[in-house]
Amino acid sequence: MTIGLVGRKVGMTRIFTEDGVSIPVTVIEVEANRVTQVKSVETDGYNAIQVTTGAKKASRVTKPEAGHFAKAGVEAGRGLWEFRLNNGETFTVGSELKVDLLADVKMVDVTGTSKGKGFAGTVKRHNFRTQDMTHGNSLSHRAPGSIGQNQTPGRVFKGKKMAGHMGAERVTTQNLELVRVDAERNLLLIKGAVPGATNGNVIVKPAVKA
């Protein structure tokens, strides 16, 4: 199964097993994912479904978005996401995907947008070691050091780890244990931390490496 669910990261807490072991979990709230479009090989070149979730103020919905949602006959949501379909999987526009979709899943992959850290140096961004605090070093404690050679090759190689913008990028954490599916409250409890800030959108899919 390649499809998943779009949810909202609520925060972290812990639950206890029957023998008293504490398990740290991230709580993901999954409101019903409404299917807004079904794509096919004939019309789009590939099979997929497009979903939305949550709600959006009417004043914040653009005219193209309003027309798209009206055509599907669903309430405007806070965004649009897409999941590829395997051969044989069928969905209809307007149908809803809920947490029970993952009821039989043990391990999941969670995708989100990592917390933005702004401009960061190499020590924070790439885990470089710091240089000596003493022994004649007075200015280069957190400097990256050499970034290459001299006239040959006369340039800095692509991919060189340097200071720059850190965070605020799409990140996937794989093989997290899905501890509990609370269908009554539309919650997923996932062991450990997941990418992103509180209230951020996350995509939960069955693990590809499980």
UniProtKB/Swiss-Prot annotation:
One of its GO terms (biological process) is translation. Gene3D superfamilies: 3.30.160.810, Translation factors. The keyword Transport does not apply. Keywords: Methylation, Ribonucleoprotein, Ribosomal protein, RNA-binding, rRNA-binding. GO terms for molecular function: rRNA binding; structural constituent of ribosome. The modification N5-methylglutamine is found at residue 151. The keyword Iron-sulfur does not apply. Methylated by PrmB. InterPro entries: Ribosomal_uL3 (IPR000597), Ribosomal_uL3_bac/org-type (IPR019927), Ribosomal_uL3_CS (IPR019926), Transl_B-barrel_sf (IPR009000). Transmembrane segments: none annotated. Residues 134-153 are annotated as: Disordered. It comes from the Bacteria. GO terms for cellular component: cytosolic large ribosomal subunit. NCBIfam families: L3_bact. HAMAP family: Ribosomal_uL3_B. One of the primary rRNA binding proteins, it binds directly near the 3'-end of the 23S rRNA, where it nucleates assembly of the 50S subunit. Part of the 50S ribosomal subunit. Forms a cluster with proteins L14 and L19. Belongs to the universal ribosomal protein uL3 family. This is Large ribosomal subunit protein uL3.
